[in-house]
Swiss-Prot record:
Stretches assigned to the PPIase FKBP-type domain: 163-248
An annotated GO cellular component: cytoplasm
Catalytic activity: [protein]-peptidylproline (omega=180) = [protein]-peptidylproline (omega=0)
Keywords: Cell cycle, Cell division, Chaperone, Cytoplasm, Isomerase, Rotamase
Alphabetized InterPro entries for the sequence: PPIase_dom_sf, PPIase_FKBP_dom, Trig_fac, Trigger_fac_C, Trigger_fac_C_sf, Trigger_fac_ribosome-bd_bac, Trigger_fac_ribosome-bd_sf, Trigger_fact/SurA_dom_sf
A GO biological-process term: chaperone-mediated protein folding
Name used for this protein in its record: Trigger factor
Taxonomy of the source species: Bacteria, Bacillati, Bacillota, Bacilli, Bacillales
Location(s) in or outside the cell: Cytoplasm
Alphabetized GO MF terms: peptidyl-prolyl cis-trans isomerase activity; protein folding chaperone; ribosome binding
Length: 430
């Protein structure tokens, strides 16, 4: 096999690959053995048609696609290794010669990982951020504790108010016609959560159980449905039931119920200590993130658009998984937020671009500084993870290995060591 790499522009180039005729004929043999099993010719059992008869009846060309499916992945992979390039997307393949008894010739247009020209990454300065724990932050944490231990109590009578869980039926109409996706029954909605289109939840306040109301809202101009975007709609709503949070009193009894402490003062002291530990971690994370962002800003990188799109794919998927944990789907989110996937991707694009830039920058710094993740480093990381998840390190290693995760773990450790270098060489100013 012969391969030639020619860079065309920016991060794109063309691999011209030539595969020996003997390999082509061998692939055609494999293709025939596969295809003939599905062919029925009078006078022959299925799968027993002679090769010459098959070719005279159907043509050898009928085997070409199956032979290409056999040849292309292996030839392309070998050519990539020989050329020493790192593709970041599937290639565009153009077969220029495919014929029995002749060499296979094809061209693969490839987008490759970009070159990173590092700027300053040592001695970077960042301004210190205030992460101090105040009485107000302790009180806010205790308030959240109250919220978590609040009891949802059915409201027998009275009007809906902000903070209530309203169970409603609703149906939306535009110009008097019901529109698709605008109807639900017994839907639980926390008033004030901002889940629905602006103005919807506010108009439910004051509604009594069993009452019906017509609510008028205006869809956002950028709403994913052009039939509704920027237009007024009327929702017919019925309030079926209400639940209200019954907040526990912050006293010694509360402390005993929710913790191992006997008094509220002890609980406050412990809460403050935990917040200080948490903010210390947040400060460390803030410093690391700021240094990485500065190093990435100082680097020159011509980002391939496809790398950003792949990152967006992952981010949208992650967002959908977070919604599922909250009992919502992406489809419902699009419906109630007035966005579609394209708009969500646009909203996430800046973060996706930053993530790709920082990843490439850290990889380049790691290479420049010869930073590697050793087996000892990875074993230490496995021990740390074992402590977090309460499982033996050997068991975690087996899990990572079974899921092809060890390479990713090595990369994560290498990245952490690279950021450690940035921190060690940095200056944090007040």
């Amino acid at each position: 096999m012969a391969a030639n790499w020619e860079k065309v522009e920016n991060n794109q180039g063309v691999l011209t690959i030539e595969v020996d005729a003997t390999q082509v004929d061998a692939a055609l043999d494999q293709a025939f053995k596969k295809v003939v099993q599905k062919v029925q010719v009078p006078g022959f059992r299925k799968g027993k048609v002679p090769r010459k008869m098959f070719e005279s009846r159907f043509g050898v060309e009928s085997l070409y696609q199956d032979a290409l499916d056999i040849l292309l992945p292996t030839a392309y992979g070998q050519a990539v290794r020989e050329a020493g390039i790192e593709p970041v997307d599937r290639p565009e393949v153009d077969v220029t010669q495919m014929e029995q008894g002749k060499n296979l010739i094809f061209k693969a247009t490839v987008t490759v990982k970009p070159e990173v020209k590092l700027g300053d990454y040592k001695g970077l300065s960042i301004e210190e951020k205030d992460f101090s724990v105040t009485e107000e932050s302790v009180d806010a944490e205790l308030k959240r504790m109250q919220e978590r231990h609040a009891e949802l109590v059915a409201v027998e009578e009275g009007a809906a108010q902000t903070g209530d869980i309203a169970v409603i039926d609703f149906e939306g109409f535009q110009d008097g016609v019901a529109f698709e996706g605008g109807k639900a029954e017994d839907y639980s909605l926390e008033l004030g959560s901002g889940t629905f289109i602006a103005g919807f939840e506010e108009q439910l306040a004051g509604l009594n159980i069993g009452e019906e109301k017509e609510i008028t809202v205006t869809f956002p101009e950028e709403y994913h449905s052009p039939n509704l975007a920027g237009k007024e709609a009327v929702f017919k709503v019925k309030l079926n039931s209400l639940k209200r949070k019954n907040m526990p009193v912050l006293d010694d009894e509360f402390a005993k119920d929710v913790s191992e402490f006997d008094t509220l003062e002890e609980l406050k002291a412990d809460t403050k200590k935990k917040l200080e530990e948490k903010t210390a971690q947040e400060k460390d994370q803030y410093v690391r993130e700021q240094l990485v962002l500065k190093a990435a800003e100082n680097a020159e990188i011509d980002l391939p658009a496809v790398m950003v799109e792949h990152e967006l794919d992952q981010m949208v998927n992650e967002f959908g998984q977070r919604l599922q944990y909250q009992g919502m789907t992406l489809e419902l989110y699009y419906q109630f937020s007035g966005m579609d996937e394209s708009q969500l991707r646009d909203q996430l694009r800046a973060d996706a671009t930053s993530r790709v830039r920082t990843s490439l920058t850290l990889e380049a710094i790691g290479k420049a500084e010869n930073i590697e993740a050793t087996e000892e480093d990875v074993n230490a990381e496995l021990d740390k993870l074992a402590g977090v998840y309460g499982r033996p390190a050997d068991e975690l290693r087996k899990i990572f290995s079974a899921q092809d995760g060890m390479a990713a773990l090595y990369r994560d450790v290498q990245t952490r060591k690279t950021v450690d270098l940035l921190v060690a060489e940095s200056k944090v100013t007040a």
